[in-house]
Amino acid sequence: MKNYKVKELMVPIAEYATVPETATLFEAVLALEKAQEQFQATRYSHRAVLVLDKNKKVVGKLSQMDFLSALEPQDTNLEQIRMFKQFGFTRKAVVLQQEEYLKNSPPILDVYSKAAKNRVTQYMRRPTEGEYVNENASLDVALHQLTAGSNLSLLVTRDKDIIGILRLADVFAAVYHSMKESELKLADGETE
């Protein structure tokens, strides 16, 4: 794996779904949909949108889970029900309580409409220290960062600039192909 460099597997920012920090959640969904359509034919689809400031610098990331979380009702009663699990209630008991409570919540189309108008900055996650990897880092370094931080992607840097995104799916594909190639060579009696 050491023969791969991060920059060989990353998706350049120019090819990734991005929106300005002034965008709404709906605009971010449209950007993700467009990027998935354009990228689908060649590689794995995008699963996040990068949020850019007015200087085109990455200030956050909005994942599919962040999108879905934006549609969850946000009120104290529901938050208290979610906390039942830490008091020993089973996941099933918590889900049943949530379902019962949600029967009286607003219609889902109203929830979608309200969330769609909110700014992406309300739901995005700002990158943390462990989410950056240098473009010249070896793939094994990136693999460690992905697994140690349970990250689905890493932001690829050149000096202080973010130039791309390294996705778990692309790393997995590279590792899988390297493993397959290595095993086939061993099966044929070759040594490295």
Report residues per predicted region:
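Residue-level signal for alpha-helical context at structural boundaries
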Residues: 27, 46, 50, 85-86, ...
